[in-house]
């Protein structure tokens, strides 16, 4: 049974016409909500990782575009002074926001859907079109909450059935909980459900360098709900699996290709390789909006690379901690690709669980989302 939502973990505050997003860069020490008024505001919030997590990015983008259009409508000389102008503003806003982060497919899929639906809306006034956009965005928001609940339910049942233990110990990476989604989470949502059902022994949270989403955000969520956890550095996962009873690795995803190859936070593939070596089932938990049947495999995924200072500086103090010199080279990919062959436990979605085949191709996600 899903528990009531913990409002402390709310990262999206929305009411028709207003949107405030939790600046997750400042957690766990400060709780600061930024008001989102314009398209530039949401593009910057996504790009600068004030809002993060593939589902949360997509939902926030849709809501923000509706809010931005409403604010534009209030201007006498704004872009939304006619039905045609409003439609053009909404469609162009979707295109702009889509460029903020390239790897997470939820953002592009959600905004492509919003564009299609806006193009189909029949409205007699600019205000009517803005209201229709708000209704569409609110539907996307509500759907993500339902997706969270389905993933939790299917995931907890599948993990306990496969592991066959009364209590399980789990490793996860990054933050895939309420802060990364609209409500409960994906991979951390499954962990939550195991905890709610009294079936969680311990969750081991990887710190997740360089942004430390595991240390800052996953630990924050576990503390808020008294979930039993242990924080580990990313490089400790093999030692952990080799020395303590670990029953499952559960991770989220930013894009799952047609064959099951999974783009997720850098370090996920390391986890999968270690899990395969030690015989630990490896699960991916994500909503169907993360499934990308148009991308055949991981080789086709564009991997975002971020600023070098994320590695050369302490992210909290902004103090440089790496020596400078002409021979210094830095590579800072945000995501890696976990081959489908290493997703041994299955892909958990709100619609059920895709279990791997014994031979390649190990998955065919079109069984859930169709070919396009």
UniProtKB/Swiss-Prot annotation:
Molecular function per GO: S-methyl-5-thioribose-1-phosphate isomerase activity
Subcellular location: Cytoplasm; Nucleus
Keywords from the named record: Amino-acid biosynthesis, Cytoplasm, Isomerase, Methionine biosynthesis, Nucleus
Catalyses which reaction(s): 5-(methylsulfanyl)-alpha-D-ribose 1-phosphate = 5-(methylsulfanyl)-D-ribulose 1-phosphate
Superkingdom field: Eukaryota
Annotated site (Transition state stabilizer): 174
Function summary: Catalyzes the interconversion of methylthioribose-1-phosphate (MTR-1-P) into methylthioribulose-1-phosphate (MTRu-1-P).
Protein name in UniProt: Methylthioribose-1-phosphate isomerase 1
Natural source organism: Trypanosoma cruzi (strain CL Brener)
């Amino acid at each position: 049974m899903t528990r009531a939502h913990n409002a402390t973990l709310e990262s999206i505050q929305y009411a028709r016409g207003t949107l405030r997003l939790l600046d997750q860069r400042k957690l766990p020490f400060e709780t600061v909500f930024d008001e989102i008024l314009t398209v530039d505001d949401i593009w910057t919030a996504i790009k600068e990782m004030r809002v993060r997590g593939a589902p949360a990015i997509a939902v926030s983008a849709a809501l923000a575009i509706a809010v931005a259009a409403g604010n534009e409508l209030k201007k006498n000389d704004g872009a939304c002074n006619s039905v045609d102008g409003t439609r053009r503003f909404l469609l162009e806003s979707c295109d702009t926001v889509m460029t903020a982060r390239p790897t997470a497919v939820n953002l592009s899929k959600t905004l492509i859907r919003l564009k299609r639906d806006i193009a189909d809306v029949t409205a007699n006034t600019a205000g009517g079109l803005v209201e229709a956009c708000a209704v569409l965005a609110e539907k996307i928001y509500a759907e993500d909450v339902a997706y969270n609940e389905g993933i939790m339910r299917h995931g907890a049942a599948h993990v306990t059935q496969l592991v066959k233990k009364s209590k399980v110990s789990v490793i996860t990476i990054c933050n895939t909980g309420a802060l990364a989604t609209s409500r409960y989470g994906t991979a951390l949502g499954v962990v939550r459900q195991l905890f709610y059902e009294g079936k969680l022994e311990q969750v081991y949270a990887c710190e997740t360098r360089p942004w430390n989403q595991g240390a800052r955000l996953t630990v924050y969520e576990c503390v808020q709900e008294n979930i039993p956890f242990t924080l580990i550095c990313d490089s400790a996962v093999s030692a952990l699996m080799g020395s303590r009873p670990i029953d499952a690795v559960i991770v989220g995803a930013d894009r799952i290709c047609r064959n099951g190859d999974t783009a997720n936070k850098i370090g996920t593939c390391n986890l999968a390789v270690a899990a395969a070596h030690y015989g630990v089932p490896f699960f991916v938990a994500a909503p169907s909006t993360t499934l990308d049947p148009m991308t055949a495999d991981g080789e086709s995924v564009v991997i975002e690379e971020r600023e070098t200072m994320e590695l050369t500086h302490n992210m909290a103090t902004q103090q440089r901690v790496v020596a400078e010199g002409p021979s210094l080279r830095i590579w800072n990919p945000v995501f890696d690709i976990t081959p489908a062959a290493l997703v041994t436990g299955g892909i958990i979605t709100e619609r059920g669980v895709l279990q791997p085949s014994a031979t390649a191709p190990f998955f065919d996600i079109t069984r859930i989302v169709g070919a396009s």
